[in-house]
Regions:
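Hydrophobic alpha-helical transmembrane segments
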Residues: 29, 33, 93-99, 299
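Non-catalytic, solvent-exposed segments at the cell envelope interface
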Residues: 143-481
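Cytoplasmic membrane-interface segments at the C-terminal ends of transmembrane helices
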Residues: 40-48, 99-122
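Internal/C-terminal transmembrane anchor helices
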Residues: 116-148
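Membrane-water interface of alpha-helical transmembrane segments
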Residues: 23, 50, 82-92, 121, ...
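Membrane-embedded alpha-helical segments of integral membrane proteins
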Residues: 58-110
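Hydrophobic, aromatic-rich membrane-embedded alpha-helical segments
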Residues: 21-57
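Actinobacteria-biased recognition of intrinsically disordered, low-complexity terminal regions
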Residues: 1-22
Length: 481
């Protein structure tokens, strides 16, 4: 006569795995397991498996709560650290796959057997699939965007050291005790019929590191005789400013980016972008304030960038030409018609920014300033999240900068502060005091210093040509910019 297994009393059988008697019961436990992984396995009398899954789930939640960022700075630090972000994305993907396995496994071990009706099989499978999809879809998008973000940071901000960017800055002290940080915004034109890049758009943005208040300075592309700082090797080469024999167009401010690396390679030291180093020093000499960093947007990709944002909204006061050359007598192929709150796609935004037929450089500079403001307005969190994949793909192709990766969280926080204030702009237009062909740089320095003075000072000493961006970009029918 056989004896019962050790630990089981004679006359009793060990309880085996349990299944639900009805499909709704099984689905209910499956839903509970989605919230509390392991609960379904415990109900099915798989004690060891259920306890292990439950313990691992609780441990994962506790670890995530401890490791997750608890404030904006922590979130930004994670977002701009590619290695940490990639690890977080991989771990999230693994946890998501494990969660799906637990949910599906719970239904498999609890569903009634045999199924009495075909609809039970179809209905149960559809419910579990929908349950998984509800969680997998949004989390999967977050994981995908995390990988895209890591790629963008690596592509744009990893190997971008220049010879002129500030030293002795850290994530803890990003501004090195300074009250302002100055960033040169460049629009570069490297079309198929041009040799090298010509920076036809040059806007120096000066941001208060405490408040985010911003003043921008629009510089004409045809500014001549631009001086370099006294301590620059370029000053020794051009003591009278950037000038020389031959075509005057080769000695304008917009030619510095292209010409200096050709004429004097490596003159400023090792750099990922020698042209950017040169134009930064030229703008510093022209304005009298240090240029810390640059951001260059290639016009050949500007169209894709705006399209990725879903377009921009600007006020069009006068018709803006598409194509056309005034000097050559070539008429435009079309016009952007006037109107308030015009929503422009990438193609039309590009021509709004660069259209030159029938307009002067100063009108074009004003439109470019309005484009910058429109892009800032579109860069709200909802729009960025909704279009992140397209923006990441476009941005990594068309944007270059020497802003260090470790300073990105500080710059994002500063940009958020800047959005709370109305920016001021100074355009250096031709006037009785200023001529791009024979500029008075002492006058330019004075204008810059006056514009950067505290707001209370402006009540008594208003800087010439200073405008409020919101007013300057408002709809004024028939009024040129």
């Amino acid at each position: 006569m056989s004896m019962p297994p050790y630990g089981i009393k004679p006359g009793r059988r060990k309880a085996g795995p349990h299944r639900c008697s009805a499909l709704p019961h099984a689905l209910g436990w499956t839903l509970l397991s989605a919230v509390l992984p392991g609960a379904g396995f415990l109900h099915s009398r798989r004690q060891r498996l259920g306890s292990l899954v439950l313990l691992l789930s609780v441990a994962t939640v506790v670890w995530a709560a401890v490791a997750a960022p608890h404030n904006l700075r922590g979130a930004l630090d994670l977002a701009f650290n590619p290695s940490r972000l990639t690890r977080a994305a991989v771990l999230t993907a693994v946890c998501l796959a494990a969660w799906v396995a637990v949910v599906v496994g719970t239904f498999v071990v609890l569903r009634p057997r045999p199924a009495t009706h075909r609809w039970q099989v179809i209905g149960g499978s559809a419910f579990v699939s929908a349950l998984c999809l509800v969680v997998v879809a949004p989390v999967g998008l977050v994981v995908r965007d995390a990988f895209a973000q890591a790629h963008v940071v690596n592509a744009v901000f990893t190997h971008n050291r220049t010879a002129t960017r500030p030293t002795h800055v850290t994530a803890e002290d990003p501004w090195n005790g300074r009250s302002r940080v100055n960033v040169l915004l460049l629009g570069g034109d490297s079309g198929p019929y041009r040799e090298g890049t010509r920076t036809d758009t040059m806007i120096l943005a000066s941001l208060d590191t405490h408040t985010g208040r911003t003043v921008t300075f629009g510089l004409p592309r045809n500014l001549m005789d631009v001086p370099f700082p006294d301590n620059s090797p370029l000053h020794a080469l051009y003591p009278d400013g950037f000038t020389g024999p031959g075509d005057p167009g080769s000695w304008m401010l917009n030619a510095v980016y292209r010409e200096i690396p050709i004429l004097h390679p490596h003159v400023l030291g090792a750099s990922a972008d020698e042209g950017a180093d040169a134009i930064k020093q030229a703008v510093e000499g022209a304005t009298g304030i240090p240029v810390d960093y640059f951001v260059l947007v290639d016009f050949t990709g500007f169209r894709q960038l705006v399209d990725a944002m879903g377009g921009i909204t600007v006020n069009v006061n006068v018709p803006v030409a598409i194509n056309g050359q005034t000097d050559a007598g070539i008429p435009p192929t079309g016009y952007i018609q006037p109107g308030p709150d015009q929503h422009l796609d990438g193609f039309h935004a590009l021509w709004y920014a660069r259209g030159r037929y029938g307009a002067d450089d100063y009108q074009r500079m004003s439109r470019q300033r309005c484009v910058v403001n429109a892009i800032i307005d579109e860069a709200n969190p909802v729009n960025l999240l909704r279009r992140y994949q397209a923006l990441a793909a476009a941005g990594s192709r068309v944007v270059s900068t020497d802003i260090p990766q470790q300073l990105l969280p500080a710059f994002v926080q500063l940009a958020l502060k800047a959005k709370d204030h109305r920016a001021k702009s100074v355009l250096f237009r031709s006037s009785a005091d200023f001529s791009p062909g024979s500029p008075d740089f002492d006058y330019m320095h004075q204008v810059v210093q006056t514009a950067l003075a505290p707001p209370a000072h402006h009540r008594h000493h208003a800087p010439p040509s200073t405008e409020d961006d919101q007013d300057a970009c408002a709809y004024h029918p028939g009024q040129s910019y």
